[in-house]
UniProtKB/Swiss-Prot annotation:
Residues 344-360 are annotated as: PEST2. Serine/threonine-protein kinase which acts as an essential component of the MAP kinase signal transduction pathway. Acts as a MAPK kinase kinase kinase (MAP4K) and is an upstream activator of the stress-activated protein kinase/c-Jun N-terminal kinase (SAP/JNK) signaling pathway and to a lesser extent of the p38 MAPKs signaling pathway. Required for the efficient activation of JNKs by TRAF6-dependent stimuli, including pathogen-associated molecular patterns (PAMPs) such as polyinosine-polycytidine (poly(IC)), lipopolysaccharides (LPS), lipid A, peptidoglycan (PGN), or bacterial flagellin. Residues 413-424 have a biased composition (Polar residues). This is Mitogen-activated protein kinase kinase kinase kinase 2. Its EC number is 2.7.11.1. Keywords: ATP-binding, Cell membrane, Cytoplasm, Golgi apparatus, Immunity, Innate immunity, Kinase, Membrane, Nucleotide-binding, Phosphoprotein, Serine/threonine-protein kinase, Stress response, Transferase, Ubl conjugation. One of its GO terms (cellular component) is Golgi membrane. Polyubiquitinated through 'Lys-48'-polyubiquitin chains, allowing proteasomal turnover. Ubiquitination requires the kinase activity of MAP4K2/GCK. Residues 409-442 are annotated as: Disordered. Coiled coil: none annotated.
Length: 821
């Protein structure tokens, strides 16, 4: 590792006392510190340096900070290298970043935005006059002092323009704020300091709308759109809310052609920035940020108040004694089950389920999107489990900054139009290997990370597991007499307390039950929305809910913490309503996923070959494909297929094939009678687009499948009316397993266990061996009607009296096997 210039080798602890961690920069964590010499506060960025690390960017940051002294640039104090730790010490800005501020206050007023733009332009003009480019202007990198001064910060990806290098040719920046000439750097031949002017225009929109344009898209897709010649510069969504001066200022700053885009100096002469703008505008903003009760009212509140009249807590009725148990409850403790089989296409939710290791760069293909991917990886060189991060504050920069990447080209983008779609023959799921020149499609921020999924899972506090006991599981009652009209249920483990929770989605809202405190026997309301579907990914609860049926994403740890605080300070009005009213939508713990209004059904699937996780959403006239983006902990739109599904409310099952980045969607299957007959899958190949004229057999006719489940990379369970076929992805019977499992009742739901298939019907369940078709478990109770509420990780079962379908229900979970968590 080469020596850094202008860096002291003295011990920085002799001068600076670290007080607390306040955020994260491009390369390291940022701490609030006290300068013991001057007694003033300072910001200290600490970067761990390893042998072989490229320190050129760190040297660049130090050099730019040292040389650029300006009232609108964070002041540089000094740098120290001690014990492989580089300390970069700067001026402390007590107001925080503008991103943090608008999270607390909501959108800025127009004159406040104008003040920020004017001050930022002053700093940029100084930088540009010194031949330097910032290359990462955004709300997270604009800091405020307590006096309302605006400072440019985080020069970790900055560059210099010299006489010999008139244009930068590296792909660098944050996707949503990136100028078109940077996104298309190879075709455009480079860029200059005017890319900062574009980024400031995007930042102005961010401050007024709480997010940059295209923010609902996956960043890779946003970059592709920006690099196209047909791309049109963004505008403010609400034309009437803002003045013509603001609209015109943005029109100039967001001029697509950089040769016609004005400089920072010229924009400082625009009426938008020359109007009277006193510092009091931002000191008032800081006062507002410190008072959360001045926050804005979320327009989504009405969606969250559909069932506020239903109780916030529901208590279980007294459990029956042994003599009062139903016949099925007696059988539940006599019949043993294997653990549910983990599907390879299920997302990996917990830190111990996967061990991330960076692959070498030789495994990356030469496309621009993958150069973006490489840069995203370099943005987070150390990947830490969530348990290590939970005690730290959220980083100031929530959106990853792209830095150093090869100078590579943009691949041709496929059309998603149904007219240009290639048809896929029914009955065959072809997966030809990708050719050497085939570019990968939109890798996620972990697409070049390899999972090692065989680690021992941590224990959790909940229903007691009995690890490594074969066939030792049974159904246990967890709630007696539930009045809710439940549609779906999942289990979840709190990342801090390790308590296991049952989460149910019902007509009356979303409720939780702590399985570690069953002696309390109390369900607590989490969300006051009607909910018809639930799924949990990385501590984010997805629900299909609301008055107009949207897909919602809920921050589970945040909601639980919010509820804990409400219990400590109870209010006289429903707390779940008032809390939502004082939190801006951008910072809300429950948010709608855009463009999902009217969604009929959803599916989540992980590609085990690439690690990508997808969300399929079936709407009446379209199909949405979204992809999980780890840095933002959310699903972002990848493709919107305008062609409607043959039956939007019918079968929707994603199937993952080797060599295919995107899943294929099975919308039907049929199989002639006979265990050796081939099953014909009806699939829609998403990489080619939907095939609108595909023929789907009507539901309910003989030979029509009711359920399709991909249990591993080449094994699929296909459930028919009275049998389950076990086939490969080509529909052929598998040689290693029984080709057909037969049942003497009409199957409603099937679940795959470790060595058997468990089929549920209205009055019970029966398990059959995957190897021999022999009965392995059977429970029948004509006095109860059974329904599976959830089978992801844990099987959750509901039963109601046969003679009184409107009665309260009992809830059960299959427990006693090795914990699903």
């Amino acid at each position: 590792m080469a020596l850094l210039r202008d860096v002291s080798l003295q011990d920085p602890r002799d001068r600076f006392e670290l007080l607390q961690r306040v955020g994260a920069g491009t390369y390291g964590d940022v701490y609030k510190a006290r300068d013991t010499v001057t007694s003033e506060l300072a910001a200290v960025k600490i970067v761990k340096l390893d042998p072989g690390d490229d320190i050129s960017s760190l040297q660049q940051e130090i050099t730019i900070l040292r040389e650029c002294r300006h009232p609108n640039v964070v002041a540089y104090i000094g740098s120290y290298l001690r014990n492989d730790r580089l300390w970069i010490c700067m001026e402390f800005c007590g107001g925080g970043s503008l991103q943090e501020i608008y999270h607390a206050t909501g959108p800025l007023e127009e004159r406040q935005i104008a003040y920020v733009c004017r001050e930022a332009l002053k700093g940029l003009h100084h930088l540009h006059s010194q031949g330097k480019i910032h290359r990462d202007i955004k709300g997270a990198n604009l800091l405020l002092t307590l006096q309302g001064d605006v400072k440019l910060a985080d020069f970790g990806v900055s560059g210099e323009l010299t006489a010999s290098v008139a244009k930068r040719r590296s792909f660098i920046g944050t996707p949503y704020w990136m100028a078109p000439e940077v996104a298309a750097v190879e075709r455009k031949g480079g860029y200059n300091e005017l890319c900062d002017v574009w980024a400031l225009g995007i930042t102005a929109i961010e401050l007024g709308e709480l997010q940059p344009p295209l923010f609902h898209l996956h960043p890779m897709r946003a970059l592709m759109l920006m690099s196209k010649s047909s791309f049109q510069p963004p505008k403010l969504r609400d034309k009437t809310r803002w003045t013509q001066n603001f609209h015109h200022f943005l029109k100039l700053a967001l001029t697509k052609n950089p040769k016609k885009r004005p400089t920072a100096e010229r924009l400082l002469q625009h009426p938008f920035t020359t109007q009277h703008l006193p510092p009091a505008l931002l000191t008032q903003l800081l006062d507002k940020a410190s008072d959360p009760h001045l926050g804005t009212l979320s327009p989504e509140d009405s969606e969250l108040e559909t069932h506020d009249m239903f109780p916030d807590t529901i208590h279980s009725r007294s459990h029956h004694g042994p003599a009062e148990r139903t016949p099925s409850e007696i059988q539940f403790h006599q019949v043993k089950f294997g653990a549910p089989r983990r599907k390879e296409t299920d997302p990996l939710n917990e830190p111990w389920e996967e061990e991330w290791t960076l692959l070498g760069k030789e495994e990356l293909s030469g496309s621009l999107l993958q150069s973006v991917q490489e840069a995203l990886e370099e943005r987070s060189l150390t990947i830490r489990p969530a348990l290590e991060l939970q005690e730290l504050d959220s980083p100031d920069d929530a959106i990853g900054t792209i830095k150093r990447a090869p100078f590579l080209g943009l691949p041709h983008t496929e059309s998603t139009s149904g007219d240009n779609a290639q048809s896929c023959s029914p009955g065959t799921l072809s997966a030809p290997p990708a050719g050497p020149g085939s570019p990968a499609l939109l890798p996620t921020a972990w697409a070049t990370l390899k999972q090692q999924e065989d680690r021992e899972r941590s224990s959790c506090h909940g229903l007691p597991p009995t690890p490594k006991v074969h066939m030792g599981a049974c159904f246990s009652k967890v709630f007696n007499g539930c009045p809710l009209q439940i549609h779906a249920a999942v289990t979840w483990v709190h990342p801090v307390t390790r308590d296991q929770f049952l989460v149910v989605g019902a007509e009356e809202g979303i409720y939780t039950l702590n399985l570690h405190e069953l002696h309390e026997d109390t369900m607590e309301k989490l969300i006051s929305q009607r909910c018809s579907w639930l799924y949990c990914v990385n501590n984010v609860l997805l629900s299909l809910s609301g008055k107009s049926t949207h897909i919602w994403a809920h921050d589970l740890p945040g909601l639980f913490e919010q509820r804990r605080l409400q219990h400590q300070a109870p209010l006289s009005i429903p707390t779940n309503r008032i809390t939502q009213r004082i939190i801006p939508r951008r910072f809300a713990l429950s948010t709608k996923i855009p463009d999902t209004k009217g969604c009929l059904q959803c599916r989540v699937v992980r590609n085990p070959y690439t690690g990508s996780t997808f969300l399929l959403a079936a709407l009446p006239a379209s199909l949405l494909l979204l992809q999980w983006y780890e840095p933002l902990q959310k699903f972002l739109l990848l493709k919107n297929f305008s062609s409607p599904l043959p039956s939007p409310a019918g079968m929707l099952e994603p199937l993952v094939l080797d060599g295919k980045e995107l899943p294929q969607v099975c919308v039907g299957a049929e199989g002639p009678e006979g265990p050796g007959c081939r099953v014909l899958f009806h699939v829609l190949p998403l990489e080619a687009g939907l095939t609108p004229d595909i023929l789907i057999p009507p539901e309910g006719i003989p030979g029509s499948a009711q359920q399709v489940i991909q249990v591993d990379r080449d094994t699929v369970l296909v459930s028919f009316e009275r049998c389950v076929r076990i086939v490969n992805l080509q529909g052929e019977p598998t040689a290693a397993l029984a080709p057909e499992l037969t049942f003497d009742f009409t199957i409603e739901t099937v679940v795959c266990l470790q060595d058997s298939v468990l089929a549920f019907w209205s009055h019970g369940m029966q398990g059959r061996s995957l190897d021999t078709n022999e009965v392995t478990q059977e429970i029948t109770d004509e006095t109860r009607i059974f329904r599976v509420l959830g089978a992801h990780r844990d099987i959750i079962l509901e039963s109601i009296p046969t003679d009184n379908p409107g009665a309260h229900s009992n809830l059960y979970i299959l427990t006693g096997h090795q914990s699903s968590y």
